[in-house]
Amino acid sequence: MLIITIKQGKEHSLLKGDPWIYLSAVEKVEGRPQERNKPGATAIVQSSARRFLARAAYNAKSQIAARVWTLREDEPVDHALIKRRVQAALARRLDAWRSADPQALVQLVDAEQDGLPGLLVHGYGGADGEGGQGGYLVCQFNAAAVEFWKVPIVQALLRETGCPNVYERSDKLVRDAEGLFVKARALAGEEPPQRLMVREGERLKPMDIRTGFTYPR
């Protein structure tokens, strides 16, 4: 297990709820080289007095050195935690997706707000699969924290939504800053069509939901 020691006085923002630990706040990182070089590996975060502060995902390639998973010492970061976080996020928003216009792009997971650092998920096509395609989930894995747990995240999304189509969209600038490869691909089922009509308020706009590009009309 990696151990991140925070510089004296730099723990205050963490204790106030800041989910990011910047490289400038890190005094040292202890652990095997293969773990230190694995983006997203779980680390124990401690104060300079060696007091437990958090469990976080460590990324040596980013200026955001660690992203907090939990402040509870008795809460392990494992498949069960990932499943619970995805379930809780979807429980807050699935009803909204089910009642939304099938052509609306509805946010289902909101990164740190849902305890899933860097993960954004939007649903299109209705939770019940308008158009016979089963709808689409478009995911952005914008941090090593969730990149590390991609497989169980996708499994949980498939199970909880019943949506068969999951597509990974990449933000190049964000993933470059995390030292992650840029990927755009279907993770399950079918890739969304290049051009779909997406409702924004009262208007329908032609959009490529794989990239967020809005076509000129």
Each language-model region and where it sits:
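A short, sequence-level motif marking secondary-structure junctions
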Residues: 57-62, 144, 210-215
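General beta-strand recognition
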Residues: 129, 136-138, 206
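Non-catalytic substrate-recognition/targeting regions of SAM-dependent transferases
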Residues: 109-116, 120-127, 147-217
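A short interface-forming secondary-structure element
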Residues: 125, 134-147
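Structural motif
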Residues: 42-43, 136-137, 164-167
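Non-catalytic accessory regions of SAM-dependent methyltransferases
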Residues: 1-125, 132, 193
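Short amphipathic alpha-helical segments
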Residues: 78-85, 145-153
